[in-house]
A protein has these predicted regions:
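Phosphate-binding site recognition
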Residues: 1-223
Length: 223
């Protein structure tokens, strides 16, 4: 959280990229750092124009009547935000790869805006598809390569921290970590059950378990 806060508090506006596999707490971390004057938008897989309508509605909470206009493309909505900005704030686009899937031109649009160095607000671009986020920002042929001021990759929590936080003996920590790894959301589900065996059955092995289809979803993220 401290690194993200520092990046957003710099003298000039920043482009911050955050990525990592699902359920690591990226969205929670970002929301914890953002203030009431910042804007958080969670994208979905609907087409680009619909996404802009949804984003405009969220932005209208900060900029009154922002959603009264129609924005025909991504450049127009980003420039409209810039025009309305009189005090720096942060705009977070979560699940950014979903936007790019529907609007392949979006990285080039952002490249243009960033290169102009006229943006008056911070941009945080977050995503769970590690392959896609890597390709968008760390591939030397990508439009946004070298444009990010900070690139943060969230990794699973390491075993020693889990053991200490939950006050587990060494053997129990290894057994539990072998199942749940260092993923905070998995540990939340584990805490709802009295024993490891019960949690394993209820959450993973049962066809009705919350995590029963989790492996498939994780592979789909990296297609």
């Amino acid at each position: 959280a401290a690194r993200l806060k520092d990046a957003l508090a710099r003298e000039k506006s920043s482009l911050v990229v955050m990525y990592g596999r699902r359920r690591l707490g990226k969205s929670t971390l970002i929301k914890r750092v953002l203030s009431d004057t910042d804007v958080y938008f969670l994208a979905d897989r609907s087409e680009g124009q619909h996404q802009r309508i949804l984003l405009a509605k969220v932005l209208a909470q900060v900029f009154p009547d922002f959603d009264k206009l129609t924005y025909p493309d991504w450049e127009s909505i980003f420039r409209a935000v810039n025009y309305r900005t009189d005090k720096r704030f942060t705009l977070c686009l979560d699940e950014f790869p979903y936007l790019v899937e529907q609007s392949p031109e979006l990285p080039s649009v952002l490249q243009k805006l960033v290169d102009e160095k006229q943006l008056k607000y911070n941009l945080v671009l977050c995503g769970s598809s590690q392959n896609m986020m890597y390709g968008l920002f760390l591939d030397s042929t990508a439009p946004l390569y070298g444009r990010a001021d900070e690139i943060m990759r969230l990794a699973p929590i390491r075993l020693p921290y889990i053991q200490e936080a939950l006050n587990l003996d060494a053997m129990s920590a290894i057994e539990e970590y072998a199942v749940w790894g260092g993923v905070p959301r998995y540990w939340e589900l584990r805490e709802n059950r009295s024993s490891l065996d019960d949690a394993l059955w209820r959450n993973i092995l049962s066809v009705n378990g919350t995590l029963y289809e989790e492996p498939i979803k994780l592979f789909q993220d990296e297609d």
